[in-house]
Regions:
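Binuclear metal-dependent phosphoesterase catalytic core
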Residues: 14, 83-86, 172-176, 181-226
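Active-site neighborhood of phospho(di)ester-bond hydrolases with catalytic His/Asp-centered motifs
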Residues: 4-7, 27-32, 51-57, 77-79, ...
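Active-site-proximal loop/helix segment associated with metal-binding centers of metalloenzymes
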Residues: 88-158
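Metal-dependent catalytic neighborhoods of phosphoester/phosphodiester hydrolases
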Residues: 15-17, 33-48, 59-73, 166-168, ...
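N-terminal active-site segment of His-dependent metallophosphoesterases
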Residues: 1-46, 59-60, 148-150
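Short amphipathic alpha-helix with an adjacent loop that forms part of the alpha/beta core around
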Residues: 15-22, 84, 142-148, 218-220
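A basic- and aromatic-enriched beta-loop-alpha substructure that forms the phosphate/nucleotide-
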Residues: 49-109
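Active-site-proximal segments of metal-dependent phosphoesterases and phosphodiesterases across multiple
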Residues: 9, 13, 34, 136-178
Length: 226
């Protein structure tokens, strides 16, 4: 059973009823895990097979970044690759577009992290690479890494069109991959879009859950104080 979870933002209690009451669950988290350690994932993994992509909040702090990218959990990040999970080929594109790197439809400032580092002063280099913030920025090379593959499902943190803040370049990636469904996080609403695209698009919002068909099993409203 494949489940898609949107934007946990550090809270995971809402997931337990779904992974404990169903057998053989693969849980795919669509970014913004916002952890301070891998402990939450370690506990949740007793009940399900966890996969994820990173979101913009996953490089807000060193601890958030290290929890998923500096531990054994980094092997479960689907960013930049296509992995077969329960018979479904799932392509992952984590992170967000940022103007300092690439804000489609504008031309990119840098093609890949190496290009960025070549033209950056030494004080901007972090641990031999791009700054912490840009560890969750999308480069053109991220899309190039998977666009010639084939997949059944594309998961991404950013939204495609027709979301008002979506990006056509994600639709183009979905078309190249030949997917039948795109699941995205980032935006905290729950939307199943009505489009003329040859694939479905589902926005899995704040602490919400859908099944593989995009049916909402849990819808949560973000009522946190701003």
């Amino acid at each position: 059973m494949l489940l898609f979870a949107g934007n946990p933002h550090g809270s995971y209690e809402h997931l337990y009823p779904f992974v404990q009451e169903n057998d053989n669950v693969a849980l795919i988290i669509l970014g913004d895990l916002q952890l301070s350690s891998p402990d939450e994932l370690d506990k949740l993994a007793k009940y399900c097979d966890i996969w994820f992509i990173h979101g913009n909040h996953d490089s807000k702090t060193v601890a958030a970044f290290e929890a998923i990218c500096g531990t054994h959990w980094k092997s479960r990040n689907l960013h930049n690759r296509v992995v077969e999970i329960q018979g479904q080929r799932i392509a992952g594109l984590g992170g967000v577009f940022r103007g300092q790197i690439w804000m489609p439809p504008n031309k990119p400032m840098y093609f890949d992290p190496i290009h960025y580092c070549q033209y950056s002063p030494q004080e901007k280099i972090w641990r031999g690479g791009v700054p912490l913030r840009h560890r969750t920025s999308i480069f053109p090379s991220d899309i190039e890494a998977i666009e010639n593959d084939q997949a059944d499902i594309l998961i991404c943190h950013e939204a495609p069109k027709p979301h008002p803040m979506g990006f056509r370049v994600i639709n183009q990636l979905a078309e190249k991959l030949g997917v039948r469904h795109v699941f995205h996080g980032h935006h905290h609403d729950n939307i199943e879009y009505k489009t003329n695209f040859p694939y479905k698009i589902t926005n899995v919002g704040f602490r919400s859950i859908t099944d593989i068909h995009g049916n909402y099993l849990l819808k949560t409203i973000d009522d946190r104080e701003k």
